[in-house]
Structure formats: structure tokens, C-alpha cells
Amino acid sequence: MFESLVPIIVAVLTGVAGPVLIVVIKNYLDKKKKPVDMVEKALEVSKLITDKIEHIKEEFQADRVWVAQFHNGGHFYPTGRSIAKFSIFYETVNSGVSSIQSNFQNIPVNLFSKSINELLENDSIQIFDFKDEKIATFGLKYIAEEHGCKSGYFFAIKTIDNKFIGFLGLDYTKRKTKLDIETINHISNHAAAMRSEEHTS
């Protein structure tokens, strides 16, 4: 009689012990994994993006290259609706060129609605000469003049599922610079490649 119960006992023990053993092994392995340090990860991402924009500055002979990201900036009173803002998080400049990063922190999106909408719809803005009245500047002319920018090129950074998360800017302060379509496309590819680095920050 006992012999007929052996297969049942083995099946019960296997059914119970198997999943328990899997959980024990999984917990053991999870404890051995090094936890991801948030600060370490942020610094890693920052280095990747800083290296990328430094490369872009050198490759395209820009005087200032920067990356802005959209973020939440508090809430409207009394509706409680979220305020969309952007800040320049990364910047590299040539010697003798002023930084603009500290001037562009927590900026409400609606203050630059023309230019941001243009980036949202068409992915780039190309302004060869900010002083040329025939060129559309999308509300950026006075800001550019204030920061000594003669030519500016701006590129949307979007996620794979087309969410607009930020933008890349190239400023030419020492001379007007006209970039050809091949160069524009090349920089667009750089902006597209940034989406993975930025989205993980």
C-alpha cells in the first residue's frame, strides 16, 4: 500500500519544493546583484551626453552646444494643473564664449511656444542669420542677440514612440554659419541618438 503512495508523495514534494527552491534561489541571486546607485547612474548619463555634445561642437565647429529637457515645474493655482517647463541640463562652450545654462532653468514652455511648436511639428529650426528679417526666427531673435548668437540650429529630441522630451541647440557666436542639408541631417541623427541617454536620466 505504501508503495502505491510513493509516486503521489514524490509528486507533492516536487510540486511544493520546486517553486520554493526557485524563490529561494531567485532571492539569493537578487541579493548578490549590486543595487543601481541613482547618483552613479545620473553621473554616467551626464558623462555620455557631455561627451556627445563636446563631439558635436568639435565636428560642426559650433561655439556653444547645449541640451534642454522638459520637466514638471509645479502646479497652477487654483486649478492644480501641471506646469510644463524646460531647463538646459547640459552645455559645452568654446573659450571666450558665454554660458547660457544658468539663464535657462525652469522656463515655462509657453514663453517659447512658437519655437517649441516648430520643433514638435518639424523636428528642427535652422536660422543662418538672426539679423536677416526674411528668415523666420520663431520668437528667438532677441534671445539670440542678447546671448551673442549669430546663427542657431535646434533639433527636437524624441523618444522611439515619438514623445518630445527635449532639444539640442548649436549656437554660432563668432561668425554666421550656414549648414547644408547633409550636415543638418547628420546633426538630426546625433539628436535622435541622444534619446536613449536622456530618457534614462
Where are these regions (language model features)?
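Intrinsically disordered, low-complexity terminal regulatory regions
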Residues: 10, 19-95
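Well-ordered, non-membrane alpha-helical segments in soluble/globular domains
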Residues: 45-52, 109-113, 185-188
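Short hydrophobic/aromatic beta-strand element in the GNAT-like acyltransferase core
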Residues: 12-15, 19, 23, 64, ...
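Regulatory sensory and allosteric helical modules in signal-transduction proteins
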Residues: 87-147
